[in-house]
Amino acid sequence: MTDLTSLTLAEARDGLANKSFTALELTDAHLEAIERARVLNAYVLETPAQARAMAREADVRIAKGEGGPLNGLPLGVKDLFATEGTRTTACSQILDDFKPPYESTVTSQLWRDGAVMLGKLNNDEFAMGSSNETSRFGPVVNPWRRQGSDAKLVPGGSSGGSASAVAAGLCLGATATDTGGSIRQPAAFTGTVGIKPTYGRCSRWGIVAFASSLDQAGPIARTVRDAAILMHSMAGHDPKDTTSVDRPVPDYEAAVGKSVKGMKIGIPKEYRLDGMPAEIEKLWTQGAGWLKSAGAELVEVSLPHTKYALPAYYIVAPAEASSNLARYDGVRYGARVEGRNIVEMYENTRAKGFGAEVRRRIMIGTYVLSAGYYDAYYLRAQKVRTLIKKDFEDCYAAGIDAILTPATPSAAFGIGEKAGADPIEMYLNDIFTVTANMAGLPGIAVPAGRDAQGLPLGLQLVGRPFDEETLLSLGEVIEQAAGRFTPERWW
């Protein structure tokens, strides 16, 4: 029998439909794989009893010829999504053993469509990080290794657990969130596919907030088709989220394999950075060549305000975080550290409950929102954000269908490798991805090649608002040309 954990989500769906195996067998295979791969630290909570119960229910539906599009398919859930009655901590000590009394909209839609929950996945604390090293549960290990080395590498962040689990065959797909690149960067580091949908496409209700005007939920999967299948269930209007957009959800899977002939692909000159590694430059050129061979037209474009995106992002995001994280005070839920009075209790709780990176970002955010600096920093960053959005609008108005860029400035680096470095060095990992968040646009990261040490590298496509379908069509061209990427099992 085929190793059930090596199947794509689409293959598993077809296998269940033609009764090659049961949902329970599929779920058990993944639960066993999770047990064998605990060294990766991808899961912070395993839910085997719940998973088996959901799988049995799926098998009953299959026997009756009923069930939704994800019936019996085992998924992992980033620990940022509220799961009713199941511990949700955002991988922070301050949320301690919090069990939400409600389910996030995105996960409730997955369960509505028949998916099975295997457990909660590790992430950077409150989704703040680019390496999954800030989690209270410890770092996630990338299933990929450099050739000839057993050094542990980061999977990227903040959705490192999601990316690592998908790459290692510990789930068929996973939920993730992207505030400045937290879906696309881990996908690029692990040889998986990650989609950050248009802002407002997927509900944010029930997702622990980092920066509300930037956060967006999306899937990480093994293939473009798998990501499209998950997107269909995750997307949709939600009246509980005021930023959710009421427009029909298209058949994303139908876009996979569609011709890209005649599409105009923008190649932004500002993304050619000083000191860019030659292999990233080569990968980008190669990806553009694949799209051209498929019938697309390449056009050099200008996004002149790109150079301001990263500094503006690191003003806007911490400002929103300092506001969102003000609610964690130890009064109603989560951890509480007593003090002589209520103010001291707040201070003790927040000092002990938040990790160093979260404290750093709260302090930056509070500083830029303070009376003396609001105009100089926050207001100016919001103006820059408008200019970044206009750069993209001008490109699309000129007939560009999507923009092709590298996904990351390098392949995965070692755990602890940047621990003593200036935090800005870590923030530079987001250099190619933050613009899509600042402009609210959809982006996809697709594996496109490997570096000299055998590690996966990804390319990014950024599209028009609510045109994820074009990204899926283009992404599949790159996927077909580059082939599938699977790490060699060492765990």
Curated annotation (Swiss-Prot):
The active site is at residues 78, 158, 182. GO terms for biological process: translation. Heterotrimer of A, B and C subunits. The gene is gatA. It is an enzyme of class 6 (ligase). Pfam families: Amidase. This is Glutamyl-tRNA(Gln) amidotransferase subunit A. Keywords: ATP-binding, Ligase, Nucleotide-binding, Protein biosynthesis. Allows the formation of correctly charged Gln-tRNA(Gln) through the transamidation of misacylated Glu-tRNA(Gln) in organisms which lack glutaminyl-tRNA synthetase. The reaction takes place in the presence of glutamine and ATP through an activated gamma-phospho-Glu-tRNA(Gln). Gene3D superfamilies: Amidase signature (AS) domain. It comes from Nitrobacter hamburgensis (strain DSM 10229 / NCIMB 13809 / X14). One of its GO terms (cellular component) is glutamyl-tRNA(Gln) amidotransferase complex. InterPro entries: Amidase, Amidase_CS, Amidase_dom, AS_sf, GatA. It catalyses: L-glutamyl-tRNA(Gln) + L-glutamine + ATP + H2O = L-glutaminyl-tRNA(Gln) + L-glutamate + ADP + phosphate + H(+). Its EC number is 6.3.5.7. It comes from the Bacteria. Belongs to the amidase family. GatA subfamily. The keyword Hydrolase does not apply. One of its GO terms (molecular function) is ATP binding. The keyword Transferase does not apply.
